Amino acid sequence: MANQKCDELIELIGLQRFYIESITNVMAETGKKWYDGEIGIAEEHMITNIMRKVVEINNHKIEVKGLIEGVVVICNPGGDDHTMSNLVLEGLLKIRKYKVVNIGGNWYMDENTKATNTAIINFTIETRPDIVFISVTIARYLFNAKLIAKELSKALSNTKVFLGGLGTQGVFEGELQNGILLANKDTLNTLNNL
């Protein structure tokens, strides 16, 4: 039933608008309700899991036909395992004919921060992407994301390396090392200027 309603809405407004307007608003409202104590963490996780499934199903339906625009790696720093924004970004990039390699997810820091960073960096370098998006949802992982971005911008001089997400609020372009770009808070603006 829920998938049918989503499909009807996507048919009406298009997948991009569905992701930007509907999914983003549901997740923002859910986060606000959790933060304000109106719902518990279990309810927040349930809603997130439902929305994640909806996005994953629709991402798998996107067919990239013809020449691709380039290869994009999406990742997040160790410890920041909020993958919802990565999945939405993946779909928006696939709509624009990019081949997307999404390695965001459950990277746990513990004592292995350096090993985690190295794994992310090495995989990304081996992939040789045209663009890298490092998504930071929680600000405490921003330092780690900047370390990854710094290494990638040195190793992949012809690759655009973007740092973005809720965890980058308050960061200014001038604070970032040369070769690292701050993704616009308006996701579509960033994507339209690739």
Regions found by a protein language model. Give the residues of each.
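Long amphipathic alpha-helical segments
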Residues: 1-63
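A short, charged/proline- and glycine-enriched loop
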Residues: 66-72
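ATP-dependent carboxylate/acyl-activation modules
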Residues: 53-55, 83, 92
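Residue-level signal for short, function-critical loop segments
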Residues: 76-80, 106, 138
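Short helix-loop-beta junction
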Residues: 88-102
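Peripheral docking tails and interdomain loops at the edges
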Residues: 161-194
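Cofactor-cradling patches in redox/metallo enzymes
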Residues: 100-101, 108-172
